[in-house]
Amino acid sequence: MINRFSIEKVKGLEIIDSRGNPTIRVFVRTNDGVESFGDAPAGASKGTREAIEVRDENGLTVKRAVDIANYIIDPALHGIDVREQGIIDKILIDIDSTENKSKLGGNTIIATSIAALKTASKALGLEVFKYIAGPRLPKIPIPLLNIINGGLHAGNKLKIQEFIVLPIKFNTFKEAFFAAIEVYRNLKGLISERYGKIYTAVGDEGGFSPPLEETREALDLIYTSINNAGYQGKIYMGMDAAASDFYDPKKEKYIIDGKELNPNQLLEFYLDLAKEYPIVYLEDPFEENSFDMFGELQNKLNSTIVTGDDLYTTNIKYLKIGIEKRSTKGVIVKPNQVGTISETFEFTNLARRNSIKLVTSHRSGETEDNFIAEFAVGIESDFIKTGAPARGERTSKYNKLLEIENKFGLEYGGKYFYL
């Protein structure tokens, strides 16, 4: 039955992301004139099992994705109640009919799915996070700030993709976040002093990319910055290895720090680092099919949250394997990896039922939309990854979290987090 919540129009628009690459924004409007939008982010380091984007001209346009939104999705969703997220997403999945969303495009589908959710919350007069959370009162997640970039995110010789700080032992998100900013500023000063001011320019995610060659050089810089800022024992360290990117499948070796390491040698490498530094978070330490090696490392690093990103790609099929093998204590949550909000909810619900920590994440190619921050709060994610405290497409998410905490008085998850 047509009512004020019925979808009247779906419209696609080509915009750009934070790397200057084209992406798609989809608007969803109801019969009552309520409208919102969803943007499709894009990653630089991608798991092979992620939903496929529809792009043209070697990735230089998304005109076909826009046409799909305007001429296929628009009529398919016309008249559907915008509050029926499950029905909307099922229609998109059924029309696409591929396992990897390659017909309509994962980018087109996720932008539409996000737009529908945001429009529904707006039509009901609710904040997005409240619409997602329902009656429960969620907490603000702990931020994972990527402050030194390596791997595919940088032009230096570091193989580890992200070096992260986690401000945990604070009473509020604001206290935690601004403490992390102090560390970031200290790091900037150290880099300028040791390598020159030119290396304080920021990368895709707002982190620094000094001319480093080995993992310990980056960890030393961050550890020193934490101590200089006076937050030893309150701010911890983490890494996103993105190990698939430095794995040579022909040799079955990992090429890192000028060495070729087999999986067991790489495991010992991580164990040594965990003894030397306060590392409590380790993402994608092995290539994306190594469920057993993830599990072995997690078993030996019980106080560290080993986390799967490329391992799972926000896909329930692979999470079930990880649960069976006890591969990780944490999972990355990226809605665009799987393609719809409903599938993302299935993934996060299964993880929660198995006491696995949720790490909601941005992508390296982002827009200024702050949806992922509201989403992280709504699902009560334990952590949020959305870059360094720099660049507008990153700070928009942090500013939204500050606003939510201030306006609604939500408690900070780090206050109750035990290592």
Curated annotation (Swiss-Prot):
Cofactor, how bound (note): Binds a second Mg(2+) ion via substrate during catalysis.
Recorded GO CC terms: cell surface; extracellular region; phosphopyruvate hydratase complex
Swiss-Prot/TrEMBL GO biological process terms: glycolytic process
Cofactor dependence: Mg(2+)
SUPFAM superfamilies: Enolase C-terminal domain-like, Enolase N-terminal domain-like
Keyword Transcription regulation: no
InterPro entries per record: Enolase, Enolase-like_C_sf, Enolase-like_N, Enolase_C, Enolase_CS, Enolase_N
EC number annotated for this UniProt entry: 4.2.1.11
Amino-acid positions noted as binding Mg(2+) in the UniProt annotation, renumbered to this chain: D240, E283, D309
Entry annotated with the keyword Magnesium: yes
Localization terms from the record: Cytoplasm; Secreted; Cell surface
Record key words, sorted: Cytoplasm, Glycolysis, Lyase, Magnesium, Metal-binding, Secreted
SMART domains per UniProt: Enolase_C (SM01192), Enolase_N (SM01193)
Pathway: Carbohydrate degradation; glycolysis; pyruvate from D-glyceraldehyde 3-phosphate: step 4/5
Record-level Gene Ontology MF annotations: magnesium ion binding; phosphopyruvate hydratase activity
Positions bound to (2R)-2-phosphoglycerate: Q161, K334, R363, S364, K385
UniProt record similarity statement: Belongs to the enolase family.
HAMAP family: Enolase
Summary of the function given for this chain in its UniProt record: Catalyzes the reversible conversion of 2-phosphoglycerate (2-PG) into phosphoenolpyruvate (PEP). It is essential for the degradation of carbohydrates via glycolysis.
The protein's name in its UniProt record: Enolase
